[in-house]
């Protein structure tokens, strides 16, 4: 049921170009787009093992719901979502890498553009610095093109890859290493002083209600604006659209009351052609 994603060198980020010549003997890639795919459970178990203990992995039922997005029909002016997982297996059929993500496109008459929310990425230590990570960062671009076509947009429309990252902290070297890896690849950070960003409170609704306090998480979006990686500013309207797309994705599974403070902050963002600084992700 799964199939191999296309290895398109032109989709590699500027800092990931060496991946085009990487030797990855025996690595087999699987693009998973259905919970019925026999490889899905392998990918889900791996992500849950690595991200579940720190409270950063969704429940199985949430991912099953997201896969149902993939068969939705376009509705004018409404968002379309496409959830997918990439699994890389080594010659012994062990997990070499796994990532999941959601492509988001608003259908016409909305402007043609695609946002890709990069959820989780895990690379086995044996394959770090091998060039595998570069491909795992590039594969979602082809899914974005597929969704643009489904929405009846032009395939050359702008594509932005987005990862939500912790704000850099001197006392958190692991976070710093992740930020530096994306920085080297060509990602830029939205200046949090100009457009502060919140991730939803991921606790169960009952836990939120019992605590009496909603706790959205301050984070920072880091972006790869495909084809515009060297630019150090972006218009506010473009960044607003990217964050709107991410919040539209979350709003499909979160209660309106839990999303309300995030939308309130979004509405207060600058708009129009106001230039928003795009910083180095590791910059404190």
Specify the residue positions occupied by each region the protein language model found.
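Terminal substrate-recognition subdomain of acyl/acetyltransferases
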Residues: 1-39, 46, 50, 152-284
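Short acidic, gly/pro-rich beta-turn/loop elements at beta-sheet edges
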Residues: 109-111, 128, 173, 232
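Short, surface-exposed, polar/charged, turn-prone segments marking secondary-structure boundaries
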Residues: 55-58, 144-150, 187-192
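A conserved beta-strand-loop-helix scaffold within acyl/acetyltransferase catalytic domains
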Residues: 33-34, 44-125, 147
């Amino acid at each position: 049921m799964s199939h191999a994603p296309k290895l398109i060198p032109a989709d590699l980020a500027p800092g990931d170009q060496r991946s085009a010549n990487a030797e990855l003997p025996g690595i087999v890639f699987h693009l998973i787009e259905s919970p019925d795919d026999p490889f899905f459970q392998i990918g889900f178990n791996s992500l849950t093992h690595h991200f579940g203990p720190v409270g950063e992995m969704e429940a199985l039922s949430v991912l099953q719901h997201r896969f149902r997005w993939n068969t939705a029909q376009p509705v004018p002016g409404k968002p379309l979502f496409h959830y997918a997982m990439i699994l890389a297996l080594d010659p012994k059929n062990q997990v070499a890498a796994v990532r999941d993500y959601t492509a988001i496109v608003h259908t016409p008459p909305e402007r043609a553009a695609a946002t890709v929310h990069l959820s989780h990425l895990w690379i086995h230590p044996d394959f770090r610095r091998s060039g595998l990570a570069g491909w795992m960062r590039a594969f979602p671009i082809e899914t974005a093109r597929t969704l643009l076509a489904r929405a009846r947009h032009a395939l050359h429309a702008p594509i932005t890859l987005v990862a939500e990252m912790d704000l850099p902290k001197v006392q958190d070297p692991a976070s710093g290493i992740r930020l530096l890896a994306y920085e080297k690849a060509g990602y830029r950070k939205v200046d949090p002083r100009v457009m502060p960003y919140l991730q939803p409170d991921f606790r169960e609704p009952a836990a939120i209600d019992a605590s009496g306090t909603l706790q959205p998480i301050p984070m920072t979006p880091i972006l790869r604006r495909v084809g515009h990686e060297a630019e150090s500013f972006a218009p506010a309207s473009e960044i607003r659209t990217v964050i709107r797309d991410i919040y539209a994705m979350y709003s499909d599974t979160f209660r309106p009351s839990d999303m309300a403070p995030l939308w309130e902050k979004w509405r207060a963002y600058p708009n129009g052609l106001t230039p928003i600084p795009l910083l180095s992700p590791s910059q404190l």
